[in-house]
């Protein structure tokens, strides 16, 4: 069934027509089918991984059908309308699972963005990326730390003398609270990582918690908060005490080189210049349709049929409860791991042991809430890390980046001027208002608690940054259900405790016509990200092309930047690792 939206580019997306006659008889309808020459592909999932796979396959002449359980495409990356908020010809207020963050360390996703046509943009949707010029580390009970970002799209906001005074106080206050020897020690620990060979990283550091690697337990509270807890919980949604050093340090290394301008696609921080569906997802789906890709939305995969060692069909249920069997020559599973593994029955799992290992992969909550304000509130020209907030909140004021929009003119009822979009990464610690975890709160309590935590970090040193009088409404990700004694989240995030990497599968499976894509698949970036989803889809397509004996050009899969200057250190460390010795810089 095709579902269209009336006010956004979501009107471009939806499913194809169901086979109603067979469904009406209570049978299982046949969707899509095998093609002459083995060119038909069923992509199971319509998020970043699924759309990337469809993109690469369709450009190589395959007949692609995408099946998505939600009523919209784009997965967790999509934006969405806030129901009932558009008036006077304006679009509904824009909501989202969480704000977009597309750093310069990404290479594969930006390549895809360049290949999505967008009117007036010579580089397609890539030209819709905009770089913030600064960031803010909000400290509760102290002055905040405001930092410029090299390569931003504009100069940082003008500093008043008071701004400068507060920034200097915040910087030195934090610096002096982290003893100099601890800063030096952290740098030395990072050198251990930078000079470690791949074998040591994958087999040793993968199994060491970041907390232990950085010796956080014996360090100051600020060392723990800034360099250990904040880096892991606010960014990778994993507790420092259990987060894999391999995952955290891989990300940290990439950002260091990005900040130095080495091997990057662009500045260290980028976001989109409009709501995501407008700037990216809508144009993407439109382009894929032009290539012949078909979409079924509201169709959930229930089972995979295995015959003769190959997948013969995928059993799906549409939004009306009717069952369909999607037949194709090739199948690409592109669902999040918590949903994908429910579709692998005993026969499918028996065909490839790596599928069963996926049951050990863990997910957690990292979910967004948006606050709609009656006044423009550009706190800083960039993201804010509320590093002391109990719920590990990050935020950004969005209207300042949407250059093609006047917020009041284009969205809502004409009185809303800004959207403060927040991500909540910690749902299991008590807040400051009710003494309850986010999962124990009602939706209304979550909104009030997040607002209070924002103010606690921003309004705590004599300034009123967020005024209660300008708060009009809020929107919490509808995938989250709270109340009634049970909290659920239909769109969770893969997390990376120690020992995760060996349980992550490869894109190629032992079933010759079945391939995996998604941010849980083993990829170079390691962290569950849009970049990882995109790269995994490219890997899956390459495996499919190889299995099909195709002469089509293979997808480019770009790895993170690794400086040649460090290769000699890594080679020597490989020898030490094989001899059972520690890294030469690892002195305890």
Residue map of PLM features:
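Glycine-rich FAD pyrophosphate-binding loop
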Residues: 59-80
């Amino acid at each position: 069934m095709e579902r269209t939206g009336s006010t956004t580019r979501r009107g471009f997306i939806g499913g194809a027509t169901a086979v109603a006659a067979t469904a009406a008889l209570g049978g299982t309808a046949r969707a899509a089918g095998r093609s002459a020459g083995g060119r038909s592909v069923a992509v199971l999932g319509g998020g970043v991984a699924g759309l990337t796979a469809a993109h690469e396959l369709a450009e190589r002449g395959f007949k692609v059908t995408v099946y998505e359980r939600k009523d919209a495409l784009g997965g967790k990356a999509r934006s969405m309308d806030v129901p009932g908020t558009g008036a006077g010809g304006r679009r509904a207020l824009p909501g989202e699972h969480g704000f977009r963050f597309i750093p310069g360390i990404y290479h594969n996703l930006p390549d895809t963005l360049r290949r999505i046509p967008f009117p007036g943009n010579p580089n397609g949707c890539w030209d819709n990326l905009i770089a913030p010029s600064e960031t803010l580390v909000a400290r509760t009970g102290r002055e905040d730390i405001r930092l410029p970002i090299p390569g931003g799209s504009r100069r940082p906001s003008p500093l008043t003398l008071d701004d400068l005074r507060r920034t200097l106080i915040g910087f030195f206050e934090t610096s002096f609270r982290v003893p100099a020897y601890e800063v030096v020690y952290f740098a030395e620990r990072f050198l251990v990582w930078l000079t470690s060979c791949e074998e040591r990283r994958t087999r040793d550091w993968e199994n060491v918690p970041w907390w232990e690697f950085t010796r956080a337990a014996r360090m100051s509270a600020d060392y723990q908060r800034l360099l250990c807890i904040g880096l892991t919980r606010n960014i990778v949604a994993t507790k420092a005490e259990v987060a894999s050093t391999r995952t955290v340090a891989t990300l940290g290394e990439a950002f260091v080189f990005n900040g130095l301008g080495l091997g990057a696609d662009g500045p260290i921080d980028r976001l989109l210049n409009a709501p995501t569906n407008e700037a990216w997802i809508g144009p993407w789906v439109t382009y894929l349709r032009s290539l012949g890709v078909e979409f079924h939305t509201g169709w959930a995969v229930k089972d995979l049929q295995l015959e003769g060692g190959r997948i013969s069909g995928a059993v799906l249920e549409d939004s009306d409860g009717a069952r369909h069997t999607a037949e194709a020559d090739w199948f690409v599973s592109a669902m999040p791991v918590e949903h994908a593994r429910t579709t692998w029955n005993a026969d499918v799992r028996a065909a490839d042991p790596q599928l069963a290992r996926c049951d050990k992969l863990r997910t957690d909550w990292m979910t967004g809430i948006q606050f709609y304000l009656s006044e423009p509130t550009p706190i800083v020209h960039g993201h804010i890390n509320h590093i002391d907030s109990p719920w590990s909140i990050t935020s950004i004021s969005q209207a300042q980046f949407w250059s093609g929009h006047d917020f009041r003119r284009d969205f809502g009822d004409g009185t809303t001027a800004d959207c403060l979009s927040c991500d909540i990464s910690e749902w299991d610690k008590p807040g400051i208002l009710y003494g309850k975890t986010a999962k124990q709160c009602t939706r209304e309590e979550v909104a009030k608690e997040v607002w209070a935590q924002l103010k606690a970090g921003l309004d705590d040193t004599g300034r009123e940054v967020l005024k209660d009088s300008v708060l009009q409404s809020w929107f919490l990700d509808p995938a989250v259900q709270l109340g009634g004694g049970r909290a659920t989240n239909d769109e969770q995030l893969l997390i990376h405790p120690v020992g995760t990497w060996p349980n992550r599968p490869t894109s190629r499976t032992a079933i010759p016509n079945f391939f995996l894509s998604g941010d849980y698949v083993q990829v170079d970036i390691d962290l569950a990200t849009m970049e990882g989803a995109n790269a995994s889809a490219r890997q899956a397509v390459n495996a499919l092309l190889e299995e099909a004996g195709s002469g089509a050009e293979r997808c480019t899969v770009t790895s993170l930047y690794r400086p040649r200057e460090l290769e000699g250190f890594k080679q020597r460390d490989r020898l030490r690792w094989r001899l059972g010795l520690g890294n030469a810089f690892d002195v305890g």
